[in-house]
A protein has these predicted regions:
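Outer-membrane beta-barrel translocator domains and adjoining extracellular loop/strand segments
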Residues: 110-115, 166-176, 197-203, 238-249, ...
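Detector for outer-membrane/organellar transmembrane beta-barrel domains
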Residues: 227-228, 252, 257-381
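Outer-membrane beta-barrel "beta-signal"
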Residues: 389-395, 401, 418-432
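Transmembrane beta-strand segments that form the barrel wall of outer-membrane beta-barrel proteins
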Residues: 156-167, 230-239, 263-274, 354-358, ...
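Gram-negative bacterial Sec-dependent N-terminal signal peptides
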Residues: 1-25
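Residues that define the transmembrane beta-barrel architecture of outer-membrane proteins
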Residues: 92, 133-142, 171-175, 213-217, ...
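Outer membrane beta-barrel
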Residues: 83-238, 251, 255-260, 290-293, ...
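N-terminal periplasmic/intermembrane-space "pro-region" immediately following the signal or transit peptide
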Residues: 22-108
Length: 432
């Protein structure tokens, strides 16, 4: 029995051994395949890691190159800005501006003075040495200006110097020269009373009847009453050659912005007129407006009433007359107005239509005291039309026609009391 069991066990073991060998053989093959797959996976991971590292290095190189380019660009840009910024020896920022201006005029009728600009108050009366068929040209209105600014812990200090060549015999002439600190201005600039802001645009550098281009040495204070209203007070040297200046002219101007399109300016002036033997108070009021009808259409108007002064508003008669003893015996009063409309047709073209009128009071005492009634005017008027063309931004070309007349208080020997101004003006400007 035992022998049978041993034989049976032996036979079972003998039969199972080949099967175990076959199973072991299969397991080894699978392990080898797994090892090969793991090895391939490791190789693939290594290649992927190398690729990622290479990409990262390339990205760093690109970013580094980009940063270098950006730094170079910023450095170059900064260099240009620094090169363009001008400073004075004292450290003030400096801005240069101005224009080169060529004026020409063909005068069919007009004044006898050699200058080509407005002479309406002195044009010869008809038939009396009229200056007709004259061509005139000049570059004297060429302008050069410097703006200065110094920053301080309190507030900025600014200044301006501007000159042209409209002095005697084309001599250099100061237009503006002033210091501005806070609300205060000291120096020479536009009069606080006779401002040019409300005159219609002209080519003529001296403007037309009803306007004023007066610049005076002055001390000015600007007080802001609100966001839309400010009051400007000034003491001015009116440079009136007919008067012995003892006290400055006092002027006041109230500006009010009604809305984005309408601006109004009310002005007043009082000054003393003095001779060696007498004194008289002169005064005046003014009212100006600027109205933007549309974004491309603008109306300007300015009105003055003045008594006893001829130094602020252009083209007026002498403010006062004296006798042989230097006593003031009469004063002149006048009213003047100018109005015009400017239309911007497109970015290159714009044009203006304007009209100006001045009328003196019929003061018989003044008229009878005139030494020459043909040289004082009962009234003056001028009308003009112009067009400006700007082919490119720095260049401006203009053409203008103006006609006007003056009527004297007394007739010339031939009986004429009227003189005419009849001109065509042209201008070419390069602004910088």
């Amino acid at each position: 029995m035992l022998t049978f069991k041993l034989k049976t066990l032996f036979i079972a073991c003998a039969c199972s051994f080949p099967m175990m060998s076959f199973a072991a053989s299969n397991t080894d093959a699978e392990l080898q395949q797994l090892r090969d797959e793991v090895k391939a996976l490791k190789l693939l991971m290594q290649q992927y890691a190398q690729q990622q590292q290479s990409n990262a290095q390339n990205l760093q190189q690109v970013q580094a190159q980009s940063n270098i380019t950006k730094m170079n660009a910023e450095s170059t840009s900064g260099l240009k800005i620094e090169t363009m910024r001008l400073k004075t020896k004292a450290g003030a920022e400096l801005t240069l501006y101005g224009n080169v201006r060529a004026d020409a005029s063909y005068q069919a009728e007009g004044g006898s003075a050699t200058r080509l600009y407005n002479q309406i108050n002195t044009v010869p009366l008809a038939g009396n040495s009229e200056s007709s068929d004259r061509l005139k040209a000049t570059l004297a209105a060429t302008r050069l200006g410097l703006d200065f600014k110094t920053s301080t812990p309190d507030q900025d200090i600014s200044a301006k110097i501007e000159v042209d060549f409209l002095g005697t015999n084309d001599a250099l002439r100061i237009r503006h020269a002033y210091i501005n600190y806070g609300n205060w201005l000291v120096g020479q600039t536009w009069s606080n009373f006779a401002v040019p802001d409300y005159m219609p645009e002209t080519i003529d550098a001296l403007a037309y009847v009803g306007g004023a281009v007066k610049r005076t040495p002055q001390v000015r204070y600007n007080h802001k009453l609100s966001q839309i209203t400010n009051l400007v007070l000034a003491a001015e040297d009116s440079k009136d050659e007919s008067s012995n200046l003892r006290l400055p002219a006092l002027t006041a101007r109230l500006n009010h912005q009604f809305n984005e399109r309408l601006l109004l300016s009310a002005r007043a002036m009082a000054t003393e007129k003095k001779t060696d033997a007498d004194t008289e108070t002169a005064w005046g009021i003014g009212l100006g407006t600027k109205f933007d009808v549309t974004d491309k259409t603008m109306i300007k108007a300015d009105y003055y009433h003045v008594k006893g002064d001829s130094s602020f508003v252009s083209w007026s008669n002498s403010g006062f007359l004296t006798n042989a003893n230097k006593e003031i015996i009469a004063t002149n009063a006048f009213d003047s107005i100018t109005i015009g409309i400017t239309q911007q047709f497109n970015p290159q073209f714009k044009g203006t239509l304007g009209y100006g009128y001045m009328k003196a009071d019929q003061n018989d005492t003044y008229i009878n005291a005139l030494p020459d009634k043909t040289k004082a005017n009962k009234d003056l008027w001028q009308a003009w039309a112009n067009v400006f063309y700007s082919p490119i931004k720095p260049i401006s070309l203009g053409l203008e026609y103006v006609y006007g007349e003056r009527e004297a208080f007394g007739p010339a020997p031939n009986g004429s009391q009227t003189g005419s101004d009849n001109r065509v003006n042209a201008v070419a400007m390069y602004n910088f």
